[in-house]
């Protein structure tokens, strides 16, 4: 399911980004990690938010520097690539219909079943670091992760963004 609206997001650096509802997926059907990343990258490309090299950059970076995280009972991933592949800052969100395997961040050998993906497409490296830190804070709250996983509508997603101050 795809969304239709945009929600503006302010970061610590005063930079404005968007959670575009056209690249927000609830119950994304993906056969594996690569399929999920390709679908999300394609949605960013179709919205003219990233360059044609963004998908390749995300896939290559994921191979070298895995982004899978095991947080309590949840598996999630925060894939991203270099800022030169970004036209306009964006964060794509997907909850997956069925979990897919990602390799664990910091340990390229172990895998985690991922059901939530936050794909970062940010123009400035400092924004990327700031957003990664903010997301890591959010990921420490199991209740919030459960709410993201159970989110089925744009309205619920929008309310959740407001709750975690990513509105």
Regions found by a protein language model. Name each.
Residues 1-167:
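Cytosolic covalent-transfer regions centered on His/Cys nucleophiles
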């Amino acid at each position: 399911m795809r969304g239709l609206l945009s929600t503006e997001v302010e970061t610590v650096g005063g930079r404005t980004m968007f959670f575009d509802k056209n690249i927000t997926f609830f119950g994304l059907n993906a056969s594996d990690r690569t399929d999920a990343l390709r679908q999300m990258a394609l949605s960013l490309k179709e919205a003219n938010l990233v360059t044609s090299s963004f998908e390749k950059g995300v896939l290559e970076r994921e191979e070298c520097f895995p982004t899978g995280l095991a947080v309590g009972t949840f598996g999630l991933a925060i894939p991203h690539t270099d800022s030169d592949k970004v036209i306009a800052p964006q964060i794509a969100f997907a909850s997956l219909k069925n979990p897919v395997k990602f390799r664990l961040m910091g340990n390229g050998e172990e895998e985690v079943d991922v059901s939530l993906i936050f794909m970062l497409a940010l123009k400035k490296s400092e924004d990327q670091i700031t957003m990664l830190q903010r997301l890591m804070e959010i990921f420490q709250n199991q209740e919030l992760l459960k709410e993201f996983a159970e989110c089925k509508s744009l309205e619920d997603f929008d309310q959740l963004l407001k709750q975690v101050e990513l509105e």
